[in-house]
């Protein structure tokens, strides 16, 4: 019968016993239960040991390092007896200068070279089958392992793409499975992606790099976990004259513990919630229960109705959470703002919108995302000066591109949004509208008093309409009255419950509709929600696909980029200098929507930041 080598405290000599035997004492044990856990071996020259150890430490998801042998103990006599085995099965792949040159049943012929080599003991994935069972799902045959285009963090010559394994999961079982995986496997059990394989750079699941073909039945969601077979690419990348690695599917059993082993009972900071954030391409994201609850608290805070407009009827649960999750995955964001409600004044813009947009820009900059603002062409000079002043006064870190769009056709919108007009390569991943005039069903644009301001508004709505048909571009609308771009998602409620709603309701829908008593508050809340997500260990690991080091919660650059009473007072002061008026009263002064900055807005900003940065 096949034999599984149990490696306990005598790891070095046991490895020697393992690799010098001509008997195949390794077998696939990924679904075995008990205290022992499966692991694979990588054998490298001693000179590369420190670099490979560090490479594993900065890519712990796919490469959980359990231990390594001490070179001087390689030649200790083997301890214990090896039980009867089948003969002749290969156990190792041999690598020479980065190329796999053959498979070996033993390393006996390399005993001299092994004196100056180190064996690394890498934890294999926890038992997915056990997690499936715990979540009430049937066990499935082990699937293949696919190479992604996600790069591991490079260190001293070791560089390779992440390799993943997949299981198809019914939609209604996703959260239960993810929680079971995290409970059983801790950080190692958390998936790195749920949704379209192409978001990982996997073109065909049916053609894995290792193992059997992977198939995802219709109606189920492909869920991916990091694979320890990532180590094979690392071994190849270093191009050392001689190295060895366990053949895929072959493991040894050990009682060595991962330093990041599951705690047994998950705390709210580690219990994951699963959220659907995109249908085309299919994409789910996760955040911890505690992070999600914080963001829900922000949503509740900004949802008050100081103007008694009836916005409570427009509120949709978790829109702020889903919008911020989607934004966190975006690489490039385009933000639009500007509502020329004061059509008899110059400039006609109001003080609601630009501060919220700039606050979001500031935080996206801190996250090192590409970000640009798009405005009406007639208001380009105004917004250019506002941004320049914001940089000069420290509200923004650096200048950002300010774009315009004149429209004309569906083709023009697609050409603007995509590189060379190709919908396969969008320039932006996410569009955000904050207090931006939105097109009504009759094609006009109305302020809250039902005055048509179409002559002052460029057709930026067309970009949101085009984005609906371009896979990979999501959108968010932030509004406080229902006539703002993106509020088409709640247009029926606007028509029923908002004054003049039957006329002014925006007809253009965003994927996510964030409703706030003042739209600026929605911009502040999006920035705060991103801070919460990036400080969440569960979401952060998912976002970086379990490769690379994590950043400490409350990173100083992120904290400094959050909205603050001081920065927002400066921002409103900049608008006042440029004669921008309050939306309700028309006053040029320190107020937004007829509400004074000191007391009302300052208090809201401080409350949002306090909730955001509070320790759980």
From Swiss-Prot:
EC primary class: lyase
Q: Where in the cell is it found?
A: Mitochondrion matrix
Return the Pfam families for the record.
D-Glu_cyclase, GLUCM-like_C
- Which InterPro entries does this chain map to? D-Glu_cyclase, D-Glu_cyclase_mito, GLUCM_C, Putative_hydro-lyase
Q: What is its EC number?
A: 4.2.1.48
As listed in the record, the transit peptide stretches over 1-28
Descriptive protein name: D-glutamate cyclase, mitochondrial
Q: Which gene encodes it?
A: DGLUCY
Q: Which species?
A: Homo sapiens
